[in-house]
């Protein structure tokens, strides 16, 4: 919060040798690189990432939907270098480890609201507290809406609009020498597909090579304004649900932790390039 970070991409800008960028062709999908190792083809589901993402002990096999709001996170760790001993495969470059807040013994709550340009309307809230002497509960809700950063000169409207809703309930049971926490998450992200534009490369060799293929030239500055010229906005429909169960048992002067998890994800997107 002190950094005013909103997504993992913001965290990456303050971390040496780390790029936690968003994938260009699939919104809200990570294209993470640590120490030069990563995967640039995350629009293809079969591409294995070299930088793993772990939330509450659950590894993400596919890093769709990881570039979302950081609200309700207790901690974020960026581990550089191979992490196979701890997390198995797909972590040769490193890992991004996140932990959400746990249900508290004390009743408390927090609300965060943001209004910004381009129709940004964000509201997030979390409430936590005891349900009984041995049971604590928590529920967090994240809602984000925006009209889109780009203006489509062909369709005459904004492009890049998205609507995000994430609901994350959790419950903790405490007993003599053990505790068990179940964390569920349901999320839906709907909006436009990727925003693309053609532009004239300011390099003679590249220009001639591109033009030789029959591609039409657009003699414009790609960084001058936030416009796009595609014939359609495209579409994004991304949803997932997950469940993590963490069991901690005091055993012989230490703690034995067991984590079981499942995540089901459905993603459908298309765009005009």
PLM region spans:
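Short strand-loop junctions, especially beta-strand C-caps/beta-turns
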Residues: 37, 58, 112-114, 231
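Acidic, small-polar-rich N-terminal luminal/periplasmic segments of exported/outer-membrane proteins
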Residues: 1-106
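Short loop/turn motifs enriched for small/polar and acidic residues
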Residues: 35-37, 144, 183-187
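Outer-membrane beta-barrel domain signature, strongest for Gram-negative TonB-dependent receptors
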Residues: 156, 162-273
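Short structured motifs
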Residues: 18-20, 124, 229-230
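Outer-membrane beta-barrel translocator/receptor signature
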Residues: 49-50, 62, 71-80, 85-152, ...
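Short, solvent-exposed loop/turn and secondary-structure capping segments
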Residues: 46, 88-89, 150, 193-195, ...
């Amino acid at each position: 919060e002190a950094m005013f970070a909103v997504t993992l991409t913001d965290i990456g800008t303050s971390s040496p040798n780390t790029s936690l960028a968003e994938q260009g062709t699939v919104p809200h999908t990570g294209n993470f690189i640590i120490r030069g190792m990563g995967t640039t083809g995350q629009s293809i589901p079969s591409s294995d990432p070299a930088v793993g993402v772990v939330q509450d002990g659950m590894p993400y096999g596919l890093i769709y939907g990881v570039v979302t709001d950081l609200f309700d996170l207790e901690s974020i760790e960026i581990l550089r270098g191979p992490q196979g001993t701890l997390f198995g495969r797909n972590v040769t470059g490193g890992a991004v480890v996140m932990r959400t807040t746990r249900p508290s013994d004390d009743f408390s709550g927090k609300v965060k609201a943001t209004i910004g340009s381009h129709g940004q309307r964000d509201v997030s809230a979390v409430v936590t507290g005891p349900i009984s002497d041995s049971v604590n509960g928590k529920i967090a809700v994240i809602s984000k809406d925006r009209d889109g950063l780009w203006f489509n000169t062909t369709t005459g409207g904004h492009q890049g609009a998205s609507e995000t809703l994430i609901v994350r309930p959790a419950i903790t049971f405490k007993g003599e020498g053990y505790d068990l926490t179940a964390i569920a998450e349901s999320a839906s992200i709907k909006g436009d597909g990727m925003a693309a534009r053609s532009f004239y490369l300011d390099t003679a060799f590249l220009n001639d090579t591109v033009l030789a293929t029959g591609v039409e030239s657009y003699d414009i500055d790609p960084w001058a304004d936030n416009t796009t010229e595609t014939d359609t906005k495209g579409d994004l429909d991304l949803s997932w649900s997950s469940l993590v169960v963490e069991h901690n048992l005091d055993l012989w002067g230490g703690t034995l932790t067991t984590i079981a998890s499942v995540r089901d994800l459905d993603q459908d997107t298309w765009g005009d390039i």
